[in-house]
Amino acid sequence: GLPVCGETCFGGTCNTPGCSCETWPVCSRN
């Protein structure tokens, strides 16, 4: 399946592909 977006994002970027930091401080599916 798709990678889970749940890491904390720093600098407005997420390491997981397809994830967004708009829900800072935790990445979510964009």
UniProtKB/Swiss-Prot annotation:
Post-translational modification: This is a cyclic peptide.
Source organism, top-level taxon: Eukaryota
GO terms for biological process, alphabetical: defense response
Cross-link Cyclopeptide (Gly-Asn): where in chain: G1-N30
Pfam families for the chain: Cyclotide (PF03784)
TM annotation in the entry: none
Keywords: Disulfide bond, Knottin, Plant defense
Disulfide bonds: C5-C19, C9-C21, C14-C27
Domain notes: The presence of a 'disulfide through disulfide knot' structurally defines this protein as a knottin.
Function: Probably participates in a plant defense mechanism.
Protein family per UniProt: Belongs to the cyclotide family. Moebius subfamily.
Name of this chain's protein: Varv peptide H
Lineage of origin: Eukaryota, Viridiplantae, Streptophyta, Embryophyta, Tracheophyta
